[in-house]
Amino acid sequence: PEHYPIVDFILGLEKDDILSNPARKTYYKTFSSPMQRILTAYCQSGGNLLVSGSYIGSDMSNSQGNREFTEKILKYGFQGSLKDTRSGQITGLGRTLQIPRLPNEKAYAVTAPDCIVPVDSAFPVFVYQPGQYSAGIAYKGNYRVFAMGFPFESIESETDRAIVMAAILKFFGEK
């Protein structure tokens, strides 16, 4: 953390996708085994980690080791993917945000963002609307984690992105 007080790990739509190209299996994994070791060491040394992406839960739910990493280190559990609604509305941090759920000409579609729930002493920070499914968590312990089950960059409003990032940076800076 002395060199990198905050790490922003932006995953977008990245996931393990063996069906479309078997050769790329580990390259697109959200958190490969080596990356899990690096992020674990970073967190255990007191770092501040921001993680966002549509598949940060679903891509990690296929093995006990992957689930242990997300639950014990990143402090969230996977509750499912939001596939049944087309609403791109998310509430949290005193804001109502919008993400694109359908294909459009301006930004990539976030068709199935992950519902991630807090584990241990983590707490919810974002909720998908309607339905009240958890969309993001924060953890404050010997290190800090702020995780979003949707890509940060998919927040449509530039103003909302700036306000959310300012709130995250403030959370990381609190004593």
Where are the regions that the model predicts?
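Short amphipathic alpha-helices and their capping/turn segments at secondary-structure boundaries
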Residues: 1-2, 136
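Short loop/turn segments at strand-loop or loop-helix junctions that form parts
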Residues: 4-19, 53-54, 148-150
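A glycine-rich, often tryptophan-bearing local segment used as a flexible ligand/cofactor-contacting loop or short
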Residues: 14-110, 120-122, 130
